[in-house]
Amino acid sequence: MVKASANKSRRKVVTGLQVGSYVKVTDNSGAKVAMIIGVPGYHGRLRRIPPAGVGDMVVVTVKKGTPEMRHQVVRAIVVRQRKPFRRPDGTWVAFEDNAVVIVSEDGTPRGSEIRGPVAREAVERWPRIGNVASIVV
């Protein structure tokens, strides 16, 4: 039997990314392209590749960007994914690219602006991203 409080957990978004995925960095922190190397909090089966979706925090390594940012291991929030996911009202949402925003440990964005749209699911879970986002879809 499922407890009533168990239903209040976050909404499940279809995961369109995994460890090893290259993603676009959509803020002005200095990074351009990053690779996902971990998903904090994921406890899965042995040898299963951890998945990530919109609104999830991931650990990335910066592959392209300014010399200060390159080869750094930082945290990021997934704000867009190509894989379509369904919202509770029945609409399907898919973006043109897979994109992340680099953040600190507590979820504060490192950059001062976010280019392009940001999924509403990411803003609901990480409100500080919504303060810097130009468009929330």
Curated annotation (Swiss-Prot):
GO biological process: translation
GO CC terms in record: cytosolic large ribosomal subunit
Record's subunit section: Part of the 50S ribosomal subunit. Forms a cluster with proteins L3 and L24e, part of which may contact the 16S rRNA in 2 intersubunit bridges.
Any one Pfam family match given in the protein's UniProt record, by short name: Ribosomal_L14
Gene3D superfamilies on file: Ribosomal protein L14
Domain of life: Archaea
Name this polypeptide is given: Large ribosomal subunit protein uL14
Family: Belongs to the universal ribosomal protein uL14 family.
NCBIfam families given in the database record: PRK08571.1 (NF006344), uL14_arch (TIGR03673)
Its biological purpose: Binds to 23S rRNA. Forms part of two intersubunit bridges in the 70S ribosome.
CDD domains from the UniProt entry: Ribosomal_uL14 (cd00337)
Entry keyword Ribosomal protein: yes
Keyword terms: Ribonucleoprotein, Ribosomal protein, RNA-binding, rRNA-binding
Listed PANTHER family: 50S/60S RIBOSOMAL PROTEIN L14/L23, LARGE RIBOSOMAL SUBUNIT PROTEIN UL14
Gene Ontology terms for molecular function: large ribosomal subunit rRNA binding; structural constituent of ribosome
